[in-house]
Amino acid sequence: MALQLGLFLIWAGVSVFLQLDPVNGDQDEGVSTEPTQDGPAELPEDEECVFPFVYRNRKHFDCTVHGSLFPWCSLDADYVGRWKYCAQRDYAKCVFPFIYGGKKYETCTKIGSMWMSWCSLSPNYDKDRAWKYC
């Protein structure tokens, strides 16, 4: 029983840290975009995230954990292997004005939300459905 429990705990621990679909898994061989302790290889820290960006045919309006254990963003509108982990300053900002329900909003709103104010991450929420709490 103890041996089975020990094997399960080892398996569970490995599973938590195993990243099956790395962010840069579709890159050409010989091109290094692996992160180092200082951040992604050969990328200055001051480069800004580009929103929205397309990764694997999906449009992202904010930092994502798609294919990663930690939030990241692309440095290009179409992901081509240039990326960085998101710091607090990197997350997408509200876009004003934005359209919601055919109406223009200049500030965060509680309309459509039960408790908290929110804003759109694109000029047209009705089209993109991208939002965050304010």
From Swiss-Prot:
<feature type="disulfide bond">
    <location>
        <begin position="49"/>
        <end position="73"/>
    </location>
</feature>
<feature type="glycosylation site" description="O-linked (GalNAc...) threonine">
    <location>
        <position position="36"/>
    </location>
</feature>
<dbReference type="GO" id="GO:0005615">
    <property type="term" value="C:extracellular space"/>
</dbReference>
<dbReference type="InterPro" id="IPR016356">
    <property type="entry name" value="Seminal_plasma_PDC-109-like"/>
</dbReference>
<feature type="domain" description="Fibronectin type-II 1">
    <location>
        <begin position="44"/>
        <end position="88"/>
    </location>
</feature>
<keyword id="KW-0964">Secreted</keyword>
<comment type="similarity">
    <text>Belongs to the seminal plasma protein family.</text>
</comment>
<dbReference type="GO" id="GO:0007338">
    <property type="term" value="P:single fertilization"/>
</dbReference>
<dbReference type="GO" id="GO:0009986">
    <property type="term" value="C:cell surface"/>
</dbReference>
<dbReference type="InterPro" id="IPR051666">
    <property type="entry name" value="SP_Capacitation_Regulator"/>
</dbReference>
<dbReference type="GO" id="GO:1902492">
    <property type="term" value="P:positive regulation of sperm capacitation"/>
</dbReference>
<protein>
    <recommendedName>
        <fullName>Seminal plasma protein PDC-109</fullName>
    </recommendedName>
</protein>
<dbReference type="GO" id="GO:0033700">
    <property type="term" value="P:phospholipid efflux"/>
</dbReference>
<dbReference type="GO" id="GO:0008201">
    <property type="term" value="F:heparin binding"/>
</dbReference>
<comment type="function">
    <text>Could enhance the fertilizing capacity of bull spermatozoa upon interaction with heparin-like glycosaminoglycans present in the female genital tract. Exhibits both simulatory and inhibitory actions on the release of pituitary gonadotropins.</text>
</comment>
<dbReference type="Pfam" id="PF00040">
    <property type="entry name" value="fn2"/>
</dbReference>
<dbReference type="InterPro" id="IPR036943">
    <property type="entry name" value="FN_type2_sf"/>
</dbReference>
<keyword id="KW-0278">Fertilization</keyword>
<keyword id="KW-0325">Glycoprotein</keyword>
<dbReference type="InterPro" id="IPR000562">
    <property type="entry name" value="FN_type2_dom"/>
</dbReference>
<comment type="subunit">
    <text>Homodimer.</text>
</comment>
<feature type="disulfide bond">
    <location>
        <begin position="63"/>
        <end position="86"/>
    </location>
</feature>
<feature type="disulfide bond">
    <location>
        <begin position="94"/>
        <end position="119"/>
    </location>
</feature>
<keyword id="KW-0677">Repeat</keyword>
<feature type="disulfide bond">
    <location>
        <begin position="108"/>
        <end position="134"/>
    </location>
</feature>
<keyword id="KW-1015">Disulfide bond</keyword>
<feature type="signal peptide">
    <location>
        <begin position="1"/>
        <end position="25"/>
    </location>
</feature>
<keyword id="KW-0732">Signal</keyword>
<dbReference type="InterPro" id="IPR013806">
    <property type="entry name" value="Kringle-like"/>
</dbReference>
<dbReference type="GO" id="GO:0048240">
    <property type="term" value="P:sperm capacitation"/>
</dbReference>
<feature type="domain" description="Fibronectin type-II 2">
    <location>
        <begin position="89"/>
        <end position="134"/>
    </location>
</feature>
